[in-house]
Amino acid sequence: MASWEAQEELRELLHHLPEDDPPADLTHLLELDEMEPKVLCGENPGDEKLKKQVIKTPPMHPSTVTWHFGYKQKEDQQDNIKMRDWVPDPSKMSKSTCKRLILLGLYQACKAQEIIKMDYDVHWEKSVVNEQYFEVEYNCKMCRTVLHEPMPIMYDPETELWVKPGRLRGPLGSAVYTLKKHYERCLLTLPSLKGTRLPKRRCNPSRRYETFREHPPTRKRRSKEGIPTDQQPSTSNGDPMALLSGPCGPHSIQPPSCLLQELPKPEVGSPEMAVAMSGGPFWEEVYGDSIFATPLGSSEDQLLSQFD
């Protein structure tokens, strides 16, 4: 006995209609293959949407997308815009690579390595004082404190490197020591939950650099040998003996005991030596003890004094 599904299939076959038969002439299908695509363009409402789905643009690098949609349009609208975290060539470097190049331009490799290991958020933005300069700041991730870099940085398009504007690192100072002390202090305390701390008010790095460049500081520099150029005594009490020539001078390898040779020495058997050996004038007056006098005291003390 056939099942219920088999009976339904048999019933559908019995109710076959004439229009369900395939057409005898199939020449119109060959004409569809010979038609050009331009003929159908515009007739189908979803033709343009279908083309956009089929033709896909290649994916862009994230840094390129950020630069194009974040800075390219702003640069076209405003020429003197203050750019933040600007990447000169996104096709060759990312923000992380640009940050490392900036730190290598500001400091030596060992100092830049210390800053990267301390894991600060490094940001840079275009200066309003000079369009070529970029001001660098360091944001602490633990307490959100903003620390400023005293030296501005600039990008050289010819060499494609980040370089310092000039050689004024000494007068301007360094931020490595401040970053290290702040990082060590934050490790010992809990992060601040009261809100963002405002950055310390200080002079603009670009304006400060321009001031030092126009008016260089006139400070006395120490010579390479370690002797001041003005030949003033370098001792704490102002005694110029350390700068004199001789065995006790700064360039001598003899011990300081040579100074004792210049002091007066008491002669053996003199009253000064007797007073010094007996314990001083107070000891001699009170106890009558002296190396030239007869020892005082009991017989027991005299007996013990023979074995001294």
UniProtKB/Swiss-Prot annotation:
Residues 94-203 bind DNA. Residues 228-304 are annotated as: Transactivation domain. Residues 200-242 are annotated as: Disordered. Signal peptide: none annotated. It is found in: Host nucleus. Transmembrane segments: none annotated. It comes from the Viruses. The keyword DNA-binding applies. Residues 229-238 have a biased composition (Polar residues). Pfam families: Foamy_BEL (PF03274). Residues 207-217 have a biased composition (Basic and acidic residues). One of its GO terms (molecular function) is DNA binding. Coiled coil: none annotated. Its main location: host cell. InterPro entries: Foamy_BEL (IPR004956). GO terms for cellular component: host cell nucleus. The keyword Transferase does not apply. GO terms for biological process: positive regulation of DNA-templated transcription; viral process. A motif (Nuclear localization signal) lies at residues 217-226. Keywords: Activator, DNA-binding, Host nucleus, Transcription, Transcription regulation. Transcriptional transactivator that activates the viral internal promoter (IP), thereby enhancing its own expression. This transactivation is repressed by nuclear factor I. Also transactivates the long terminal repeat (LTR) promoter, thereby inducing structural gene expression, initiating the late phase of infection. It is therefore a key regulator of viral gene expression. It directly binds to and activates DNA target sites of viral promoters and those of distinct cellular genes. Required for viral replication. Homodimer or homomultimer. Forms complexes with the host nuclear factors NFIA, NFIB, NFIC or NFIX. This is Protein Bel-1. It comes from Simian foamy virus type 1. The lineage of its organism: Viruses, Riboviria, Pararnavirae, Artverviricota, Revtraviricetes.
